[in-house]
Swiss-Prot record:
Lineage: Eukaryota, Metazoa, Ecdysozoa, Arthropoda, Chelicerata
Key word Repressor present: no
Catalytic reactions of this protein: a ubiquinone + NADH + 5 H(+)(in) = a ubiquinol + NAD(+) + 4 H(+)(out)
TM spans (from-to): 8-28, 38-58, 59-79
Family: Belongs to the complex I subunit 4L family.
Gene name tied to this protein: ND4L
Membrane topology type: Multi-pass membrane protein
Compartment annotation: Mitochondrion membrane
E.C. number(s) listed in UniProt: 7.1.1.2
GO cellular component, one term: mitochondrial membrane
Name of the protein in its database record: NADH-ubiquinone oxidoreductase chain 4L
Organism: Rhipicephalus sanguineus
Amino acid sequence: MVTLVIALYFIGMLMLFINRHFLMMILLSIESMYMSLLLMLCIYFCFFNLLSIFVFLISIVCEAGLALSLLVMMSFFYGNELMMSMNLIKC
């Protein structure tokens, strides 16, 4: 079970490096990495220490909300979510 969780984490990291030009795919791969870490915490603590798991889950939700608002603002101001087009904008 632990090897499956580690494999899921590395698959998320691989998807992060492959799709590094699209912000939505970056956010999805980071969320999959967070979910594999949450699963690892659940296995490690065996549901005895639920407070730390809930704190980690709350931080995942806050990060996802901030990332989604960043994605919406980028698509509103710049017209797309490509990370390569951000290099062309010089302020």
